[in-house]
From Swiss-Prot:
Residue ranges of every copy of the Reticulon domain listed in the record: 578-764
Compositional bias annotation for Polar residues: 261-282
Basic and acidic residues bias spans: 328-337
Region annotation (Disordered) ranges: 1-37, 115-147, 247-400, 455-475
Localization: Endoplasmic reticulum membrane; Nucleus
Keywords in alphabetical order: Endoplasmic reticulum, Membrane, Nucleus, Transmembrane, Transmembrane helix
Protein name: Reticulon-1
Membrane topology category: Multi-pass membrane protein
Biological role stated in the UniProt entry: Inhibits amyloid precursor protein processing, probably by blocking BACE1 activity.
Gene (UniProt): rtn1
Record organism: Xenopus tropicalis
One Gene Ontology cellular component: nucleus
Main location: endoplasmic reticulum
Positions of transmembrane segments: 607-627, 696-716
Length: 764
């Protein structure tokens, strides 16, 4: 957007004065320049000096040459210096405020002053603290409020904030106007821009590889009616330096060029009242006017700061240009579709913003969080995170209203900022996926480890469900830890971050099985069945084993208890084997067992227990030795080598594991506890009927004892065990019928006895 020099000088009346050097020096330079300054400008300068404003000068500086050209001294000369140097403009004042590290960001106090005549009026004296100064400082960071920085200059200019503005403010605006140093200004298609340059100040010497940025933005408020001055409605933009004239293009020069500008309004649940008052001077005054409650911050910079201390991360394009992002504010930008359409039409027709009168201005709003409007003559914005556009082919200024709801509006701060920048360059890279992946992987590993420890603790309480958890020796536990770490590492490397979220319980169980199989492989043992719902290791296997004061005694105790694999129970102790023996499924095997037991019992009836044990041992040795000699002689005669005749029995595992012993002990303990409780209930007559039944049973056993001794009863029991199941299996129907009759008769007799005994109650 080109600036009209007359209006430009008038706009500076509210915030900047028009002279830095003494009046005599100004007169001399004015005469040397041919009196190019108009009477209107001189009158406004005198008015500004009478109002008590400090004198401010606009200076044009390059990287290797600096010359001061006053705003109201129209000197028709070229800027000397190397053509490769970069010229830039800065404002300076004789009145300097206290130097502070805080940049001028246009922050206004919320509770002290509202944006009224005090803030914007050009009339009345102002204190030095109220006037921002523009001094030459060091390089600026990317989050500076006002900065005017050359691409390669060691000395840059920045505007420091008022010391009173260091306080934390709740409502402020941030406007960032920046341009890439490698961007070339392009031809403006609007012909009205050339007509608006009737009065010019000067023109800077251009170079083809560098661009000249000159942006000045000011708001002046009429102190009589509180309205924005009608001749200050816009933001002037830069013009390309030229060799044939002074600082700005002459009316007879070629069409001006301006670089494309992207205006980004980004907000999240904030509100802004944007007004477009119509300028009474006609459509020749074009620009962007914001609401009067905004105190803007204007930044003209080519920042080179990539420091992480910046408030907002800079975005860097392919050419190395870094654009500082704006400060966030808690405001809501609102505009209606009708106003947006009218702005589009005005832009297409006049390449600028048409203004309305202050009486006709209206407030419109739109929710930036849910809409993404882009006004571009050439291309659309490539991405919502792109603070710069992607088109560098158009010479028109571009306005882009960008929404950030695609990047998680619910989680972000309620903030908004405006950015005026040149389009071009790739979008800033998002957060590194490797960082997110490493964080997710660490969280996932910690979660899996905690679940493994919890499951191991739960599994240790139910010992019968983990028959292999205690066989590991202490030396094998570091190997288990290595297996767990390798398993977690391989799982973390083979899955993405999204796969960690979808990892199911079934996959974790499979990993547990693989871990157990690896442990078994290291020990040289294998097992066929692994329960997936049972942890393969216990808490002691996950954590390093602590040494106790007992030392070797503790180690031997652990060695005696540790076991890894579930062992098959003994053949003669399994329930299935007992059923096969009782039902005579294998007649040979059942006959041997049944005969041996009866022989022992009958021997006990004739001999003592010690004699029976000795004789039985001698008989067993006689049989085995005889068979061993027989097989050896047979192999010698047949000249065969069949090996040991009892090799299959020798290889059979008959050792009892800790789990098996614990299992049988628990079963015996349960039976013992139930018997003790029942005897206590009967002898203490908790139930009289049950106690009487027990008494009758004991009375009948007296007769049985008189007829039979204990061994006889035991022999009868063994015979019954090996005979009754087979008989019942063959004659089940008849036996059930007779047993039913016997049960009925017994119940009838018991009922009659209970009826005759006084004080007894029939048990329901």
């Amino acid at each position: 957007m080109a600036a009209n020099p007359e209006v430009f000088s008038g706009r500076l009346e509210g915030n900047v004065a028009a002279a830095r050097r003494p009046g005599s020096a100004q007169e001399e330079e004015g005469e040397a320049a041919g009196g190019a300054l108009s009477c209107v400008d001189q009158g406004r300068t005198i008015k500004a000096e009478q109002a008590g404003h400090p004198t401010v000068a606009m200076e044009i500086t390059s990287t290797d040459f600096t010359s001061t050209l006053h705003l109201h001294d129209a000197e028709s000369k070229e800027l000397p210096g190397d053509e490769n140097g970069l010229s830039y403009t800065y404002l300076s004042s004789d009145k300097h405020s206290h130097t502070d590290s805080t940049y001028f960001t246009g922050i206004s106090k919320k509770g002290t002053e509202s944006p009224d005549i005090k803030e914007f009026s050009g009339v009345g004296p102002r204190s030095p603290k109220e006037i921002p100064t523009f001094d030459s400082r060091g390089l600026l960071s990317s989050d500076s409020g006002i900065e005017m920085t050359p691409a390669e200059c060691s000395e840059v200019n920045k505007s420091l904030a008022d010391p009173t503005e260091e306080e934390k403010q709740e409502a402020y605006k941030y406007i960032d106007i920046s341009r890439s140093p490698d961007m070339k200004p392009q031809q403006v298609l609007d012909k009205d821009f050339g007509e608006n340059k009737a009065s010019t100040i000067g023109q800077a010497a251009p170079t083809e590889q560098q661009a000249y940025d000159s942006v000045t933005m000011s708001w002046q408020k009429d102190h009589y009616n509180g309205n924005i001055s009608e001749y200050l409605p816009y933001v002037p933009y830069m013009e390309e330096p030229r060799k044939d004239f002074g600082l700005y293009n002459s009316p007879t020069s070629k069409e001006p060029k301006s670089a494309p500008v992207t205006i980004s309004f980004t907000g999240m649940e904030t509100t802004l009242q944007t007004e477009y008052p119509e300028n009474q001077q006609g459509k020749s005054d074009k620009g962007l006017k914001l609401s009067p409650d905004m105190v803007p911050t204007v930044t003209v910079s080519e920042p080179e700061d990539n420091s992480p201390e910046s408030i907002t991360p800079p975005s860097t394009d392919a050419d190395g240009y870094t654009e500082p992002s704006g400060l966030e504010e808690q405001r809501k930008y609102k505009i209606s579709e009708d106003e947006l359409i009218s702005a589009i039409k005005a832009k297409e027709g006049t390449k600028g913003f048409s203004s309305e009168t202050n009486e006709e201005k209206q407030s419109y709003s739109f929710n930036v969080e849910k809409q993404d409007f882009t006004v571009l003559p050439t291309r659309d914005a490539p991405a919502p995170l792109d603070m710069e556009g992607s088109s560098t082919e158009s010479g028109d200024s571009e306005i882009e209203l960008v929404s950030e709801d695609q990047v998680g509006a619910e989680e972000a701060m309620q903030s908004a900022y405006m950015t005026f920048s040149h389009i071009g360059g790739p979008p800033p890279s998002p957060a590194s996926p490797s960082i997110q992946y490493s964080i997710l992987r660490e969280e996932r590993e910690a979660e899996l480890d905690s679940e493994l420890i919890i499951e191991s603790c739960d599994g240790s309480s139910a010992s019968e469900e983990s028959p292999k958890r205690d066989q590991d020796s202490p030396m094998m536990k570091p190997m288990i830890m290595d297996i767990i770490e390798e398993e977690n590492l391989s799982r973390a490397e083979s899955f993405d971050a999204s796969d960690f979220e979808s990892c199911s319980l079934k996959e974790r169980k499979l990993n547990m099985e693989n871990l157990a199989e690896s442990a078994c492989y290291l020990k040289g043992t294998y097992h066929t069945e692994i329960r997936a719902d049972m942890p393969s290791t216990k808490k002691e296997e996950l954590l390093p084993q602590k040494k106790s004061p007992e030392g070797s005694a503790y180690q031997s105790k652990v060695l005696g208890k540790t076991s890894t694999l579930p062992l098959k129970p003994l053949p003669f102790l399994s329930k299935r084997k007992a059923i096969e023996l009782l039902y005579w499924r294998d007649i040979k095997q059942t006959g041997i067992v049944f005969g041996s037991v009866l022989l022992m019992l009958f021997s006990l009836t004739q001999f003592s227990v010690v004699s029976v044990i000795a004789y039985l041992a001698l008989a067993a040795l006689s049989a085995t030795i005889s068979f061993r000699i027989y097989k050896s002689v047979l192999q010698a005669v047949q000249k065969t080598d069949e090996g040991h005749p009892f090799k299959s029995y020798l290889d059979m595992e008959i050792s009892l594991s800790q789990e098996q012993i614990q299992k049988y002990t628990d079963c015996l303990q349960a039976y013992t506890n139930s018997i003790v409780k029942e005897l206590r209930r009967l002898f203490l007559v908790q139930d009289l009927v049950d106690s009487l039944k027990f008494a009758v049973l004991m009375w009948l056993l007296t007769y049985v004892g008189a007829l039979f001794n204990g061994l006889t009863l035991l022999i009868m029991a063994v015979v019954s065990m090996f005979s009754l199941p087979v008989v019942y299996d063959k004659y089940q129907a008849q036996i059930d019928q007779y047993l039913g009759l016997v049960r009925t008769n017994m119940n009838t007799i018991v009922t009659k006895i209970q009826a005759k005994i006084p004080g007894t109650k029939q048990k329901e």
